[in-house]
Amino acid sequence: VGIQFKLIIVGQEFDTEMPIFTESRNFFKDEIIHMGYCKSFEDYASWLWKADILPVTINQEFFGASVMEAVYCNCYPLLPKRLTYPELFNDRVNALHFYHNTNDYDNKLKSLLINQNLGHNLNEITQKYDWSTMSIQYDQLMNIT
């Protein structure tokens, strides 16, 4: 198809690299601009702020903190319609951010890569999890205020 893109893969590294990461590193060698662990939160956040699209394919997730961090940095999430995501991101209001199966995922990701005008803003979702909001709730729960 000839769609041009760059790839950022951040995450923990282990002593032995999983075969899928070795294969990805080789297959996408010209597209990868960063792959691996970030030594500081600032480094991690800087990569998130550089990203446009966050394709999520994870099979197990309890809250989705890393997804929420990326969305806070204005990444457009493409999420499976399962796990915690429909509740966190209101799948009825934000239906375009969700895919139902592999074919739907492929089509939506291709469309996002071609149509760079993403036109999204999910700040109202991330704001309620921002520390400035959460700290007040924690203080109230612990009767600190």
Q: For each predicted feature, which ranges?
A:
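Nucleotide-activated donor-binding/catalytic signature segment of Leloir-type glycosyltransferases, i.e.
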Residues: G11, P19-E42
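Short alpha-helical segment that forms part of, or immediately flanks, the ligand-binding pocket
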Residues: A45, F63, M68-Y72, P86-E87
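Short alpha-helical donor nucleotide-sugar binding micro-motif in glycosyltransferases
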Residues: A45-A51
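A short hydrophobic beta-strand element within the catalytic core of glycosyltransferases
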Residues: L54-P55
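Aromatic "clamp/platform" in nucleotide-sugar-dependent glycosyltransferases that forms part
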Residues: N59
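Short hydrophobic beta-strand element within catalytic cores of glycosyltransferases
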Residues: Y76-L79
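Conserved acidic donor-binding segment of nucleotide-sugar-dependent glycosyltransferases
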Residues: D91-N103, S111-Q116
